[in-house]
């Protein structure tokens, strides 16, 4: 069972609910979000009186949720959650595109990329300062130096930044450089200690699907973040590993409506990692938006032929402009918009 406290609930009222739960022999898991506090009652729920709990001061509602994920479940939060990133909304009627290079390379490259992102009408910029790579011999990212370059280039164009966190020890550095959105990559989706730490900060999180993760495993990973108090979670489908070897991954478009049914949180898609080739990006992007995705994470490099990593899947600035035009047309047809 979860008990949702009202936004005006006092600390005394929250403690009163916790006491009631513990008196019945259950454990109380308290998740303190920005808007409200959610208390999960863990144990034999038959000992709890739902009506009695709902009558307590400060309680908005109490719900029996059968599924293993509670806070991220749509059962208690029927309306879609809309996440505000410096005035840029993810979720709701607006579709948000996030674009930029795979890796932060040089100040000049990042300045060109930021200008190209802005010129295409994209409102958020992505870029990797710390890079998890399959081979230990490939470029691993610029680290803190890269974060400095990224922040400086994006600030010149007024763009919020999205970058991947690989290690909880880097979190203080991310806070220092005021990273606007933390990305948890596919390899870290079940790094539960990292998820717990990210759950403690007031920064939106993009949670990428593990390359072999089921929908339930993905939702449970998000529950780790939400249980820590951070409810600003964005799911990102980036393709799953199957028997097919012609392309990099298989984009699971079916996951979009399934997640929309199971959770109130926004769902975006990474078409670049799904196909692994630049020529696939536009088609996969169109499919994702048509299927109901709330946004896209698209790799764009000022000069893909010179990219230090993932050159094959990066589109160029002109292709990004064309893609944005196509996506606006699709968004209009399905009653949504890309500003």
Predicted regions and their residues:
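Non-catalytic terminal accessory/regulatory regions of metabolic enzymes
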Residues: 1-97
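Catalytic beta/alpha-barrel core
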Residues: 6, 142, 159-169, 180-191, ...
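Active-site mouth loops of central-metabolism enzymes
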Residues: 8, 95-112, 136-141, 160-165, ...
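Glycine-rich, proline-tolerant flexible connector loops at the mouths of alpha/beta enzymes
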Residues: 126-144, 301-312
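Alpha-helix-loop-beta-strand connector modules within alpha/beta enzyme cores
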Residues: 139-163, 197-204, 253-267, 313-336
């Amino acid at each position: 069972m979860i008990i949702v406290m009202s936004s005006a609930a006092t600390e005394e009222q929250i403690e009163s609910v916790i006491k009631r739960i513990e008196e019945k022999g259950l454990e109380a898991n308290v998740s303190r979000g920005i808007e409200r506090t959610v208390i999960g009652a863990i144990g034999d729920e038959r000992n709890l009186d739902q009506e009695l709990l709902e009558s307590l001061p400060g309680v908005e509602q109490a719900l029996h949720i059968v599924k293993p994920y509670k806070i991220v479940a749509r059962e208690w939060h029927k309306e879609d959650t809309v996440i505000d990133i410096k005035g840029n909304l993810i979720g709701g009627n607006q579709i948000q595109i996030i674009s930029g290079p795979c890796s932060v390379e040089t100040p000049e490259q990042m300045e060109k990329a930021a200008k190209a992102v802005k010129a295409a009408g994209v409102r958020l910029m992505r870029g990797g300062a710390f890079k998890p790579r399959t081979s230990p011999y490939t470029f691993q990212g610029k680290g803190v130096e890269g974060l400095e370059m990224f922040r400086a280039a994006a600030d010149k164009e007024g763009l919020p930044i999205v970058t991947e966190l690989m290690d909880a020890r880097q979190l203080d550095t991310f806070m220092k450089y005021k990273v606007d959105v933390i990305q948890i990559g596919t390899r870290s989706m079940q790094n539960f200690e990292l998820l717990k730490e990210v759950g403690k900060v007031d920064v939106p999180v993009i949670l990428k699907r593990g390359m072999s993760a089921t929908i339930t495993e993905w939702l449970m990973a998000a529950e780790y973040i939400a249980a820590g108090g951070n409810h600003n979670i964005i799911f990102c489908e980036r393709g799953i590993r199957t028997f097919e070897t012609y392309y990099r991954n298989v984009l699971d478009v079916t996951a979009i409506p399934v997640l929309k049914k199971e959770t109130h949180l926004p769902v975006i898609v990474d078409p670049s990692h799904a196909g692994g080739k630049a020529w696939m990006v536009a088609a996969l992007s169109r499919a994702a938006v048509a299927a109901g995705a709330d946004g896209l994470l698209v790799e764009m490099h000022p000069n893909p032929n010179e990219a230090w990593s993932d050159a094959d899947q990066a589109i160029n600035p002109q292709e990004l402009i064309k893609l944005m035009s196509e996506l606006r047309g699709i968004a209009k047809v399905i009653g949504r918009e890309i500003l």
